[in-house]
Amino acid sequence: MLRFLTAGESHGPALVAVVEGLPAGLPITIEDVAAELARRRLGFGRGPRMRIEQDEVEFLGGIRHGRTLGSPVAIAIRNTEWPKWSEEMSPAPGKTEKPLTRPRPGHADLVGMQKYGFDDARDVLERASARETAARVAAAALAKALLAHLDAHVLSHVVQLGPVRAAADHRPKPTDLGIVDASSVRCFDPDAEAAMIAAIDRKSVV
């Protein structure tokens, strides 16, 4: 059985993923994980953080000479912005001089503050951040490598966004991954892709 855990905060030194249950001898490289993290940064309307982070990957354990050892695999993804936040996000005892006391609507801030008794929303939002998904992608890259080793391949694509739907006969094959990734909305149907982008732009203006 595969199991994964993630740790780390959005502006901490790194995000960490630990994957348990991989068999020994599975070929895996840093480039395999980095390629999936690069795909995560693709897409229409990505925020500025995506342009800042380069997702530097480091294997901390469980892999030797390009193959898994059968023990848990630990991966670190360094946060580029950590030096700017090293004092604010320090694990050493102390108090912040700039507590965030206004929870953002629609986020986990308020619920997290109530659940854990925090008086600073940053204790919640640093973890409840889209940045944390980088660790999940790193963990999934290992699972994807295992599936590929078993000759099972994965491909996802967008078939509908709001009222815009791709044509039923536009269904990609695993070999079409590059074409899907080239679409800013991951749609294999170029006509639907243009309509999806237009729909997003209309919503952005409202």
Give residue spans per PLM region:
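Generic N-terminal targeting/processing segments that precede catalytic cores or assembly contacts
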Residues: 1-204
